[in-house]
């Protein structure tokens, strides 16, 4: 149907009509003093329903489909989809039986998991974490807005309100109860508020956005709130509705228990057999506006909300029991608000939940309000939609509301579904209300207004009611007949957020236009698509003359065929202007029939008619006649008619909604351009062109013009000095037009042809723009005297006559004489427009004559994304070419006011957006949860639930394992991946079989723990094996995923056949007395070869051995007293067997390698008793194999309890220390010599910035004669004025800006100077970056690496920030150089050392930073290897002591023997008497600190806390006094762990933000240094960070402070202190750099990982063994053999994989096969585009890179901050180019990234 603002289509239903209720039955309210009259319509206080949409069970995906289902009495109930409850069947062994007894029928969507995530720019990962209710609401809201004719994008930034009813948290429970797999986005993804907030977020709405939970009344309450928001002026538009999704069984079980649900899962409203309701799911959304606004906007007003009310039913018989009186009162309140007599209400849509109590109660309330007082035979009709689509609970009210609106709108009472016998508990005879049992026409006279009531109630007591009525002012009119439509062509628009969707939209529209759409005019369809639909970034447009033409062209789009009058493209990039430049060309566009079509256009005809009298008066001919006849016999007439056609075309364009934002005129076209820009009236322009044309008669035949393929500048040089010929028009970078005397022009043409240069005569006999025309200047000035009143242009106007194209010179008569004589500088004008960001050009002429020149200029300027089009073309229909040009510009993003072109009615039923759904459902991996089905980790086996198998000889144990359920207590990493120890697998075999004899055990593939696995242990006659596969994801078939066999073996039933052997322990020890090994020999050996941790906590307490045999006394639980029970199942053999496999592997210690068991010939257990806590291991070399041993496990008397027979090891490829050993964890900076580049950096100019004149003078002297210029500035601020000078050296690429902080003469001013130096450098960088200057920044510091002076300490923070600047702004950063001889300018180093952020010159040699293992020559003697550990008799102080990391340090120190601690913090703890209350409050932020302190005290430690802000300069005496007051033994160790993390980018850093971060680091360290002078402490540990070494973006301040700590530690070492700065990586879940998804991704992008608490303190212990001032604690990731490193500092510690095997678990969007980058630029672009899209697809977990739009913003595709970091890593790995962290900020799309990589890789 087609709708004007005052029209709707009537419906001919062909149904019977009951008696009229009449208007004479109105009566007053039963409230004293209040009456309801028949109030007049007040558009200001009424709310209109302008749009509706729904998605409901039974395929009811629109209100119209719902209406048809209601009329057809369809019941959409059915079985719940099987996948919904599947996770709950696995969660508890009791669940299956209970769930089988729970109602499984209801009203379900076929695919509630489906969502068009890409449409909304949501990544698959985030979509999976979004409640289906949020997804449904997004899509249905979009549909409702389109139904309302409101382009969703048009609401952006508006105060549109969103109120959505929601109260199901099924999906939230599903996700958030899966504790190990909870992720950050699940919070908002499953919150109630996420439903409305998602809508507001994606549509950029700024009005109220609220989730409404009033149980089953929620959505009608939401409609009430929306109405109020509009009437109170909060919002102009309200999006209201409700949603429900049934994702879990919990609430269904509750409702079953409460008796609310029907066992059949069906609703039987008002029926005798109603015993409860069937739950339903779906969404319903309604769009509301103030009535006056809707009328103003020409909206289709479907109904009016006259009034609404919400209340509560108070204290009833039970909170869920209904209250008829409350239902009556809320209805009366709604009627009072509406000013409506209840007797005028013809229909009530009831809540009608089909419950035995609910239906009778509700009918009695409806009867009391609407039935009382009605005459017999005139009842109020009642019905309910629930039997059709179920009870949607939070969405129920909105669904009932939609049904009521449809009934009012269509004037029909629809029949009630599932009604066989009326409920006998209701007195229908006296009720005055009647259930609709057959379809009825709405009764009444012509003047009666149709009204309906809507009821909705919540089981918590909320009652709500709404009154709606038809919009009676809308006139009824029949469907428009298309046969009367004018045959003019129309533009039909399509759009989509991704290119591939255009075909989907085209197919939908083509199908509809070919069928139902034939009943709509093509104009109404065009109006809808242009003015009532949103316009996405990918656009298509067709010019169609009729329906068949439209269908054909749309089909061509579907089939990918190019067709005339069809255009499609993406809008210009967001960084480009969408403004349109109108280009008015000059002479040469004319053709005979150029005005034939134009004169049919009323706008064109009227424009020419208005100017024709001027032409006739001035020229003596009729312009109308000449245009109609095609009479262009002379150049003079062409001049005039060209102007008129251009002015007429401009008028047509404006009438069709296109306006210029900039204008260029070419030659005579400048006159029309000035008119279009508003400088002249059309009449003034006509006077100029006619009077000048008359003067041209004097020079007719005097000359000629020729277009030549030679650049204008070159032609000027060639013709220099000649007067007969001039270069007259600069057409394009490769061509120009020459004007002059005819003979000279002809001669030039012949000459050019002889030289092979193309030359083309221009059809004219007047030498335009030649000096000979200057003779006409004075006559023209006289002729135009007093005729012009030029004004300033309303839009940008570029001149082609003036030398400066941006000249604002008045368009007076002097301008027009210059225009006649001067050269035409078109190229310069186009270039100026391009420089101003313009990319869309429209040639306004009868034929394109400069479009090619404009394109050529654009390409010459390197612009690739642009459009040049034209209004007309020779022999093409003008109406279509004009529309086509507008369509092309629209498709590129130009603004078109479509309502000017299409002001008529719009068609309501044009299809809505076509969705491209994909399933997104979180598959839960953690089940089973029940202890009866999951393996017991304390038994150290993988035996889970035993599954019966047909036959008697096979049994299968199944379980699932992840890092939370690994069957061993410790850690067992191998090459960075944790695996199950072999001992746990053998133990599994023993317990699964019950055997004591195993044989032929083959350990094929380790069982990895990195991802959740399904495990099977299969036991058959005498065989056993362990198999696994990765736990299957959602959507995978049951049989998908390969099973991998890890370990196989054989077993024998019965006990041991041999008696246990007896070993002579004493004799073995005596034999090996001279070969005593350290107790920790095995642990240290394994640590060095790469086994950094043990799966079990055994310890060797006595060890002897040679290469042939070993004996070791082992305690499997050294921390457990002998009298205490073990912390695991006592029957487990795994702990002692793990010691056996581990110690056994060390027998070959002369060939240190990483080895693991590969095969065990036999395992024998000789005892039925549990293994002992303490026993002996005897290892013998097996004679039959080089790498095989026998291991006997015996008690302390030598009785053998178990034995490994011939255990063979295999060597594992890898680097010692590569998988988590302390050697791979702890590093130190080394400074190897730098490698000089073969291509030095060009530096010809140096700008020195230094406040120290002496330093500046020294460096200037050193630079003399080595560079072209030296500029000295006192401060960075001076750079600003210099940068604004276009001629300054700062505009040159060969300029280096060098900052030199001055010396410091007093240590007291270190904090102030450090802050000053830092801010100076940051200001300097900001000026260069913000000014887009091509220069590079360098910094020279004075021996900071030696850290022996106050100057060095003050300058040290610069060493930290420098790497951050390099990371954030790599193109502007040159480098930091720490010089050893101040005054000697390191120019050669700056030029030749280019791949280092920081450089140190030592011994005259430039050196670069590399991390390397701690040097062996710094290893302390064994007696001193506890240099960083506490002594019981001393006191230890920790700053930041109440922070998470500080508390962990406290626990570690107590574990290592400390008994007195002082925890320093800025905050004071409350008195001890309050601790109990605080600890009882689980939400208290203090509770963790108090709990830790109490735990430490329980271990025998004394803990004091001091509230001292050590960042304060006067903190030293305060701290000293506070420590003395405690009367403790001397403080012998200090850990400075205080700090503030305030992530800010370099460009955002402020003085205050920097100081806030620096103070705890710098001032804090200096305060501690004052309180504890050198040599006063056993150790002084400063907690720094590795961020300043690797260049983490956003850490400018933090890196600076930590760099100071590094230097301070070195300085204290020089003074004899045992000081060390530890540059930590992120601690997992601890401290300021606690691991988050973002931090982990950032670490990975730098090639490192985080560490655990245990690893951190193992590193501490390791550092304690060395005499060093700094240590970096981090672990390298494993890189492919040829993979580039993300930062060179890792070069010497990076772990390289031994091959390049791809992971079996890689995402489906795998990278394309790598090949060489092509040579040509276009091929390179394609090559890069493919690879970058692959990377984005992998990060987003998309199935194909085809789903990645190169032009779309990465953020719109769903790339969040965490994914951005991952993307950088993918790009670096794929393309081998170092990617700065800020790249995606400056390059927000794939296309931008292609350009960046093209430049980088091209260099």
Curated annotation (Swiss-Prot):
Q: What is its EC number?
A: 2.3.1.165
Q: Per the record, what are the reactions this protein catalyses?
A: 3 malonyl-CoA + acetyl-CoA + NADPH + 3 H(+) = 6-methylsalicylate + 3 CO2 + NADP(+) + 4 CoA + H2O
Which keywords appear in this protein's UniProt record, sorted alphabetically?
A: Acyltransferase, Multifunctional enzyme, NADP, Oxidoreductase, Phosphopantetheine, Phosphoprotein, Transferase
Oligomeric state and interaction partners are given as:
Homotetramer.
- From the UniProt entry, list the residue stretches annotated as the region C-terminal hotdog fold: 1073-1218
Report the InterPro entries cross-referenced here. Answer: Ac_transferase_dom_sf, ACP-like_sf, Acyl_transferase_dom, Acyl_Trfase/lysoPLipase, Ketoacyl_synth_AS, Ketoacyl_synth_C, Ketoacyl_synth_N, Malonyl_transacylase_ACP-bd
Q: What is this protein called?
A: 6-methylsalicylic acid synthase
Choose any GO biological process term that the UniProt entry carries and state it.
secondary metabolite biosynthetic process
> Used how in biotechnology?
Terreic acid is a metabolite with antibiotic properties. Terreic acid also acts as a selective inhibitor of human Bruton's tyrosine kinase in mast cells and other immune cells.
Task: State any single GO MF term.
Answer: 6-methylsalicylic acid synthase activity
Enumerate the spans annotated as Malonyl-CoA:ACP transacylase (MAT) domain.
Answer: 581-894
Give a single Pfam family match: PP-binding
The set of disulfide-linked cysteines is: none
Function comment:
6-methylsalicylic acid synthase; part of the gene cluster that mediates the biosynthesis of terreic acid, a quinone epoxide inhibitor of Bruton's tyrosine kinase. The first step of the pathway is the synthesis of 6-methylsalicylic acid (6-MSA) by the 6-methylsalicylic acid synthase atX. In the biosynthesis of 6-MSA, atX utilizes one acetyl-CoA and three malonyl-CoAs as its substrates and catalyzes a series of programmed reactions including Claisen condensation, reduction, aldol cyclization, and the hydrolytic cleavage that yields 6-MSA.
Query: Which CDD domains does the record match to this protein?
Result: KR_FAS_SDR_x, PKS
Tell me yes or no: is Oxidoreductase among this UniProt entry's keywords: yes
Which sites are catalytic?
216, 351, 391, 667, 972, 1129
> Has the keyword Repressor been applied to this entry?
no
Q: State the conditions that upregulate or repress this gene.
A: Expression is observed in the middle of the vegetative growth phase.
Where are the stretches annotated N-terminal hotdog fold? 940-1058
Annotated region Disordered: where?
1-40, 1701-1721
List every position bearing O-(pantetheine 4'-phosphoryl)serine: 1761
Q: Where is this region: Required for catalytic activity?
A: 1783-1803
In the UniProt annotation, what is the result of changing residue 1761 to A?
Abolishes 6-MSA production
- List the gene name: atX
């Amino acid at each position: 149907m087609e709708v004007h603002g005052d029209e709707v289509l009537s419906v001919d239903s062909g149904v019977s009509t009951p008696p009229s209720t009449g208007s004479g039955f109105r009566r007053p309210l039963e409230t004293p003093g209040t009456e309801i009259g028949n109030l007049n319509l007040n558009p200001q206080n009424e709310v209109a329903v302008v749009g509706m949409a729904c998605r409901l069970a039974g395929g009811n995906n629109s209100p119209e489909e719902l209406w048809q289902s209601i009329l057809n009495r369809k019941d959409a109930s059915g079985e719940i989809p099987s996948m919904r409850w599947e996770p709950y069947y696995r969660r508890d062994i009791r669940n299956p039986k209970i769930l089988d007894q729970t109602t499984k029928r209801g009203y379900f969507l076929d695919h509630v998991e489906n969502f068009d995530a890409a449409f909304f720019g949501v990544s698959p990962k985030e979509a999976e974490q979004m409640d289906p209710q949020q997804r449904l609401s997004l899509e249905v809201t979009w549909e409702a807005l389109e139904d309302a004719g409101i382009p969703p994008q048009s609401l952006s930034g508006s105060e549109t309100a969103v109120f959505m009813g929601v109260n199901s948290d099924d999906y939230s429970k599903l996700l958030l109860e899966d504790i190990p797999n909870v992720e950050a986005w699940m919070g908002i993804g499953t919150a109630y508020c996420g439903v409305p907030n998602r809508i507001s977020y994606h549509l950029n709405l700024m009005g109220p956005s609220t989730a409404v939970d009033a149980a089953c009344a929620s959505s009608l309450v939401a409609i009430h709130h929306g109405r109020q928001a509009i009437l109170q002026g909060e919002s102009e538009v309200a999006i209201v509705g409700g949603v429900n999704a049934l994702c879990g069984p919990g609430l269904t079980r509750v409702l079953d228990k409460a008796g609310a649900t029907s066992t059949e899962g069906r609703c039987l409203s008002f029926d005798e057999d109603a015993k409860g309701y069937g739950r339903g799911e779906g969404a319903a959304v309604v769009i509301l506006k103030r009535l006056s606004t809707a009328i103003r906007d020409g909206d289709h007003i479907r109904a009016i909300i006259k009034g609404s009310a919400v209340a509560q039913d108070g204290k009833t018989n039970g909170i869920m029991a209904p209250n008829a009186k409350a239902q009556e009162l809320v209805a009366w309140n709604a009627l009072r608000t509406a000013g409506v007599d209840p007797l005028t209400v013809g229909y009530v849509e009831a809540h009608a939940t089909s419950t035995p109590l609910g239906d009778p109660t509700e009918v009695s309330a409806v009867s009391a309000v609407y039935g009382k007082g009605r005459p017999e035979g005139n009842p109020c009709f009642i019905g309910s939609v629930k039997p059709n689509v179920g009870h949607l609970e939070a969405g129920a009210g909105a669904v009932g509301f939609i049904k009521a609106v449809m009934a009012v709108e269509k004037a029909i009472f629809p029949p009630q579904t599932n009604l066989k016998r009326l409920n006998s508990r209701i007195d229908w005879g006296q009720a005055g209300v009647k259930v609709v049992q057959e379809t009825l026409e709405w009764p009444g006279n012509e003047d009666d207004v149709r009204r309906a009531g809507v009821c909705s109630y919540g089981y918590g007591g909320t009652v709500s009611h709404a009154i709606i009525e038809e919009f009676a002012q809308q006139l009824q009119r029949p469907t428009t007949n298309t046969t009367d439509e004018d045959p003019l062509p129309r533009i039909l628009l399509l759009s989509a957020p991704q290119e591939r969707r255009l075909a989907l939209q085209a197919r939908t529209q083509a199908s509809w236009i070919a069928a139902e759409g034939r009943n709509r005019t093509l104009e109404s369809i065009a109006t809808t698509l242009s003015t009532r639909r949103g316009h996405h970034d990918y656009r298509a447009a067709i010019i169609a003359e009729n329906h068949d033409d439209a269908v054909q062209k749309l089909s061509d789009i579907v089939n990918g065929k190019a067709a005339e009058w069809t255009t499609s493209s993406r809008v210009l990039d967001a960084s480009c202007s969408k403004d349109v430049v109108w280009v008015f060309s000059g002479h040469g566009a004319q053709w005979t029939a150029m005005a034939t079509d134009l004169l049919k256009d009323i706008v064109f005809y009227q424009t020419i008619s208005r100017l024709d009298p001027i032409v006739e008066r001035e020229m003596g001919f009729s312009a109308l006649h000449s245009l109609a006849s095609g009479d262009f016999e002379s150049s003079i007439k062409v001049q005039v008619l060209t102007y008129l056609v251009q002015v007429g075309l401009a008028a047509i364009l404006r009438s069709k909604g296109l306006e210029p934002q900039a204008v260029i005129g070419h030659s005579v076209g400048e006159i029309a351009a000035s008119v279009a820009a508003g400088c002249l009236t059309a009449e003034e322009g006509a006077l100029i062109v006619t009077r000048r044309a008359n003067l041209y008669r004097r020079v007719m035949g005097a000359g000629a013009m020729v277009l030549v393929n030679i650049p204008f500048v070159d032609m000027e040089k060639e013709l220099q000095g000649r007067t007969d010929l001039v270069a007259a028009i600069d057409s394009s970078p490769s061509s120009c037009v020459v004007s002059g005397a005819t003979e000279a022009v002809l001669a030039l043409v012949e000459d050019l042809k002889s030289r092979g240069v193309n030359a083309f005569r221009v059809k004219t006999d007047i030498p335009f723009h030649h000096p000979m025309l200057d003779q006409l200047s004075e006559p023209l000035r006289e002729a135009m005297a007093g005729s012009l009143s030029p004004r300033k242009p309303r839009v940008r106007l570029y001149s082609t006559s003036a030398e400066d194209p941006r000249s604002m010179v008045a368009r007076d008569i002097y301008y027009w004489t210059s225009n006649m004589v001067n050269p035409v500088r078109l190229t310069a004008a186009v270039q100026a427009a391009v420089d101003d960001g313009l990319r869309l050009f429209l040639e306004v002429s009868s034929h394109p004559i400069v479009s090619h020149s404009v394109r050529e200029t654009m390409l010459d300027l390197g612009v690739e994304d642009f459009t040049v089009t034209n209004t007309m073309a020779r022999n093409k229909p003008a109406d279509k070419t004009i529309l086509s040009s507008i369509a092309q510009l629209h498709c590129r993003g130009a603004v078109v006011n479509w309502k000017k072109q299409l002001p008529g009615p719009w068609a309501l039923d044009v299809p809505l957006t076509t969705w491209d759904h994909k399933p997104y459902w979180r598959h839960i991996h953690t089940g089973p949860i029940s202890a009866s089905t999951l393996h017991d980790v304390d038994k150290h086996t993988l035996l889970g639930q035993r599954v019966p198998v047909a036959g008697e000889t096979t049994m299968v144990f199944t379980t699932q394992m992840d890092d939370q359920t690994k069957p061993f207590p410790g850690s067992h990493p191998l090459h960075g991946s944790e695996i199950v120890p072999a001992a746990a697998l053998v133990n599994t075999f023993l317990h699964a079989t019950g055997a004591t004899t195993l044989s032929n055990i083959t350990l094929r593939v380790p069982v990895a723990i990195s991802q959740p696995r399904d495990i099977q242990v299969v036991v058959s006659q005498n065989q056993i094996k362990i198999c696994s596969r990765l736990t299957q994801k959602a959507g995978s078939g049951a049989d998908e995923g390969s099973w991998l066999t890890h370990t196989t073996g054989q077993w024998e039933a019965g006990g041991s056949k041999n008696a246990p052997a007896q070993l002579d322990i004493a004799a073995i020890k005596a034999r090996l007395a001279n070969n005593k090994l350290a107790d920790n020999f095995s642990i240290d050996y394994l640590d060095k070869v790469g086994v950094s941790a043990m799966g079990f906590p055994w310890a060797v307490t006595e060890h002897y051995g040679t290469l042939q045999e070993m004996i070791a006394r082992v305690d499997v639980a050294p921390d457990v007293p002998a009298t205490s029970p073990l912390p695991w199942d006592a029957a487990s053999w795994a702990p002692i067997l793990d010691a056996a496999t581990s110690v056994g592997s060390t027998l070959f210690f002369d060939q240190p390698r990483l080895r693991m068991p590969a095969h065990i010939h036999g395992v024998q257990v000789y005892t039925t008793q549990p293994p002992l806590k303490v026993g002996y291991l005897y290892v013998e070399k097996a004679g039959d194999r080089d790498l095989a041993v026998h291991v006997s496990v015996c008690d302390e008397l030598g009785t053998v309890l178990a034995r490994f027979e011939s255990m063979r090891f295999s060597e594992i490829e890898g680097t010692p220390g590569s998988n988590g050993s302390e050697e791979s964890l702890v590093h130190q900076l080394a400074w190897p010599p730098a490698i000089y580049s073969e291509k030095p950096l060009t530096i010809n100019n140096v700008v020195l910035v230094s406040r120290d004149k002496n330093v500046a003078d020294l460096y200037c002297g050193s630079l003399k004669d080595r560079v072209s210029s030296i500029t000295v500035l006192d401060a960075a601020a001076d750079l600003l004025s210099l940068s604004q000078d276009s001629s300054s050296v700062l505009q040159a690429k060969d300029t280096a800006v060098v900052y030199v902080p001055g010396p410091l003469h007093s240590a007291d001013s270190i904090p102030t100077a450090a802050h000053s130096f830092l801010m100076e450098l940051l200001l300097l960088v900001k000026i260069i970056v913000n000014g887009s200057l091509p220069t590079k920044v360098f910094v020279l510091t004075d021996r900071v690496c030696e850290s022996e002076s106050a100057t060095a300490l003050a300058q040290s923070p610069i060493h930290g920030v420098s790497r951050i600047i390099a990371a954030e702004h790599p193109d502007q950063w040159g480098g930091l150089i720490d010089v050893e001889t101040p005054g000697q300018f390191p120019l050669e180093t700056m030029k030749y050392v280019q791949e280092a952020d920081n450089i140190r010159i030592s011994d005259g040699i430039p050196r670069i930073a590399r991390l390397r293992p701690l040097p062996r020559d710094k290893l302390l003697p064994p007696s001193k290897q506890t240099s960083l550990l506490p002594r019981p008799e001393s006191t230890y102080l920790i700053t930041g002591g109440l922070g998470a990391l500080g508390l962990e340090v406290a626990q570690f120190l107590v574990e290592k023997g400390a008994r007195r601690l002082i925890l320093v913090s800025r905050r004071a703890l409350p008195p001890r008497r309050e601790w109990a209350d605080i600890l009882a409050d689980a939400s208290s932020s203090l509770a963790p600190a108090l709990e830790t302190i109490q735990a430490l005290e329980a271990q025998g430690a004394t803990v004091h806390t001091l509230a001292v802000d050590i960042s304060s300069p006067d903190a030293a005496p305060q701290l000293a006094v506070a420590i003395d007051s405690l009367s403790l033994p001397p403080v012998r160790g200090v850990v400075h762990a205080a700090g503030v993390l305030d992530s800010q980018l370099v460009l955002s850093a402020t003085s205050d933000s920097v100081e806030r971060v620096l103070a705890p680091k710098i001032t804090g360290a200096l305060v501690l240094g004052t309180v504890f002078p050198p040599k006063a402490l056993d150790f002084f540990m400063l907690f720094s960070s590795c961020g300043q070494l690797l260049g983490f973006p956003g850490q400018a301040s933090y890196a600076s402070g930590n760099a100071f700590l590094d230097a301070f530690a070195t300085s204290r070492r020089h003074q004899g202190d045992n000081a060390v700065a530890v540059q930590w990586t992120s601690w997992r879940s601890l401290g300021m750099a606690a691991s988050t998804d973002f931090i982990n991704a950032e670490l990975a992008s730098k090639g490192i990982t985080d560490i655990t608490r245990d690893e951190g303190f193992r590193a501490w212990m390791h550092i304690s063994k060395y005499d060093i001032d700094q240590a970096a604690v981090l672990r390298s990731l494993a890189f492919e053999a040829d993979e580039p490193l993300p930062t060179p500092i890792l070069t010497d510690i990076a772990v390289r994989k031994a091959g390049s095997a791809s992971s079996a678990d890689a995402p489906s969007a795998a990278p394309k096969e790598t090949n060489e980058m092509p040579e040509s630029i276009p091929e390179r672009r394609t090559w890069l585009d493919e690879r970058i899209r692959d990377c984005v697809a992998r990060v987003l977990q998309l199935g194909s890179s085809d789903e990645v739009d190169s032009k779309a913003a990465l953020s719109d595709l769903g790339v969040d901050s965490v994914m951005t970091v991952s993307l950088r890593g993918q790009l670096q790995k794929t393309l081998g180019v170092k990617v700065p962290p800020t790249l995606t900020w400056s390059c927000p799309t794939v296309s931008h990234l292609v350009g960046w990589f093209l430049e980088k890789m091209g260099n």
